[in-house]
Amino acid sequence: MLAKTLPLCLLALLAVGAAHAAEPPDYKPWQDLLTKYYDPAKGMSYKSLKEHGKPALDHLRQQLATVDVAALAKPDQLAYWINLYNISTLAVVIDGYPTKSIRDLSTDPIIRLNVFKKPSVKTKAGAISLNDVENDKIREGFKDPRIHFAINCAAKSCPPIRTEPYAGARLGEQLDDQARRFLNGPHGARLAKDGDSVTLHVTKILDWFKDDFETWGGGRMVFIRKYLTADKQKQLDAAKGKVDLAFDDYDWALNDAPR
């Protein structure tokens, strides 16, 4: 009898835990900023945001820094970290604007990406870096390669910011949509045939984070194919696996909207 009732008890405990998960943060202020200052076809209006929206951005960061992330349901935790990463990256650029690239905000002329190592992200547990959020909280915490199309590093080659906040209740759908949009977009996957040779040109992200896609995404080619349009899938399948990957140069120019 005990053996039969134990699984039921465990299910009951899990249900109670889910029922008592904290409500996710209010991301409406983030939506308002995106609506006012961001156009995915043009970029972020950093100048206007710095001149008119910085108080709202600062207040949003203060509010998110009070969130007890561990009390949230798992999907809400991942949504929180993705939103916080994008909001914090935006704040880093605003604080150093005008600039031609987020890399130019680094204090080390040799290691031009050390801007991502500064403790610029406010959390309830204290300030951490953008790298901490990306690598420790998001990548290792959730092991989902789709996140690489959701976090934005303020560069032109980076997958665009989503025009809405990420939400735990819709997170899987949103992450799938981000991967699909990017891989079929202007900086996405492009097949080139030269005689019997077929090359698939893709973002450098799939090179930098190869292990994420191989370990958590079933392999780079499997992951890419899943999100391509039916027409591109047919072209890929016609190559019968004889496809070389080539990685595009990464454009670190700021994703700044033309003024």
What label would you give each PLM region?
Residues 17-21:
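Sec/Tat signal peptide C-region and signal peptidase I cleavage site
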Residues 1-5:
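Positively charged n-region of N-terminal signal peptides that target proteins for export
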Residues 22-82, 86-259:
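Interaction/scaffold regions that mediate signaling and macromolecular assembly across diverse proteins
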Residues 7-16:
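Bacterial N-terminal signal peptides
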